[in-house]
């Protein structure tokens, strides 16, 4: 049986709560999440689950390679993805913030020096500081952002925060909030028109699972950040 919808799911922190939601909605992957396969059908053959890096969900869905997916709003805003966002899922909640060592001034440096900002989100970071009227040097890193000020790579960082534990462990303090982040369902615009009934069925099942079963589904409070 050919799957009617291909759904891109992000590897990492969001995968467990995303799979729990789909299971509660009645879509069980035919193979365990530990499989090395990147494309796995649901047990009933209705869906095909595509496991990709979080930042790639928007790429696959926007291009039409996947009909739908689950993504954090952080990667969607960074990519400026042209996709539909019909359903917020209520997990993966955190915030994107500016942080720095307590002794490092913010929002300006002594002598008018240009601040260096380390981040995985260069577009959003640039836009935030441009709105403040502040010129900064963006240093794009793929991970371990919190260590950048400790090694004098940057003065400030922009990253995701939930409890703030990781900031405290690295002697950083939150300076400004850029945006609130959470997991959402994303849908390709053309696919939504061409496969409207299938998308409506899936969205209703996910909405019902979110509303009625989220408390009993394991891992549905998973976070994007710490």
Model-derived features with residue positions:
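Domain-level signature for soluble enzymes in the chorismate/prephenate branch of the shikimate pathway
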Residues: 1-226
């Amino acid at each position: 049986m050919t799957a009617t919808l291909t759904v891109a799911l992000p590897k990492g922190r969001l995968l467990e709560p995303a799979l729990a939601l789909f299971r509660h909605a009645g879509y069980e992957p035919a193979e365990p999440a530990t499989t090395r396969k990147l494309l796995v059908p649901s047990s009933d053959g209705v869906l095909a689950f595509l496991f990709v890096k979080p930042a790639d969900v928007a790429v696959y869905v926007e291009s039409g390679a996947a009909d739908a997916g689950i993504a954090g709003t952080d990667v969607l805003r960074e990519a400026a993805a042209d996709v539909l966002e019909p359903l917020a899922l209520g997990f993966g909640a955190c915030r994107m913030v500016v942080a720095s060592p307590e002794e490092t001034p913010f929002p300006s440096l002594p002598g008018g020096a240009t601040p260096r900002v380390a981040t995985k989100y260069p577009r959003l970071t640039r836009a935030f500081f441009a709105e403040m009227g502040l010129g900064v040097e963006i240093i794009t890193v793929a991970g371990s952002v919190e260590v950048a000020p400790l090694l004098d790579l940057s003065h400030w960082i922009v990253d995701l925060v939930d409890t703030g534990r990781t900031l405290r462990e690295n002697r950083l303090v939150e300076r400004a909030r850029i945006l609130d982040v959470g997991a959402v369902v994303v849908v390709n615009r053309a696919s939504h028109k061409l496969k409207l009934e299938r998308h409506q069925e899936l969205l209703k099942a996910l909405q019902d699972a979110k509303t009625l079963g989220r408390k009993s589904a394991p891992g549905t409070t998973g976070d994007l950040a710490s």
